[in-house]
Amino acid sequence: MADLRAGLLGIGQMGRHHARVLREVDGIELVGIADPGGDAHGVGGPLSILPDVEALIGLGLDIAIVAVPTRFHEDAALKLAAAGVHTLVEKPIAHSVESGARMVDAFGGAGLVGAVGHIERFNPALQELRRRIEAGDIGAVYQIATRRQGPFPARIADVGVAKDLASHDVDLTAWVAQSPYSTVFGQIALKSGRPHEDMVIASGRLENGVIVNHVVNWLSPMKERVAIVTGELGTFVADTSTGDLTFYANGTFPLEWESVTAFRGVSEGDVTRYAFPKREPLRVELEAFRDAVLGLPSDVVTMEQGLKTLAVVEGVTESARTGESVSF
């Protein structure tokens, strides 16, 4: 079978990595790159940088990656769908739920694969976490808490931290727990003088009863990417910046210290850091997209799933505006 002919729209901070990995994945040939801003990162190689999505479509593509600012996702995606091109757009799916819904309809109606680049699902720590939860290693899951903090990224100008970063945590939480959100409550802050929120606190509950909490901001001088799952038998801590997964087991030995034994809760047990293969998440994601296009079993994030994530994120900001929780 001939390689899938791939086009890449946008070679900024994320698109440049797509350019590298698309050239490495078996079964894909990168035949065209488009970016109206040119090749700032020097990733074009032998390919001339085209001006727009129409020029890309003219190359006769099988698949496309859209890595442009969020406000341009819908226009590019609808043109690609009309041309019969299977497409993966970077997260979030779109700048609004209404826009994302039009994209879902376009790709579904055309019988095409429409996917969203929620790359955290392909992080080795989170994949191992989900596998161990499924295996019952933690027993019943009680709570999932995430922290995603760091300095402001110069690449983001058209959305706030909720859609840019909290979308990661909303998606990975529902995916790890295998349950959608039922309610969310949010608080936001604007501290940097920009038009969009740069700090978010969100809490909520999933349909399966798990309670969740997310701390997200662009105003921390240190970078933190952590997901903590507390359950019946202990706590998992996944560090997605390093790909590490650690399990803190509940203690099984009787306690003798009187002030501790008086507390009717859990005690500290063994701590285990797991060893497992750590493949590059973007490569695994693009392989999943390729497989979906070929009709093979795939864990690619569909546009329908991406739209649900965006709806929850918009629920967080709506809750912050009204002071009321939002239900789904």
Outline where the language-model segments fall.
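A contiguous active-site-proximal alpha/beta segment in oxidoreductase catalytic domains
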Residues: 94-156
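C-terminal helix-rich "cap/oligomerization" subdomain common to oxidoreductases
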Residues: 1, 23, 63-65, 288-328
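Hydrophobic residues in well-ordered beta-strands that form the structural core
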Residues: 89-90, 114-116, 238
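C-terminal glycine/acidic-rich active-site capping loop/insertion
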Residues: 119, 233-304, 328
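N-terminal Rossmann-like dinucleotide-binding module
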Residues: 1-44, 173
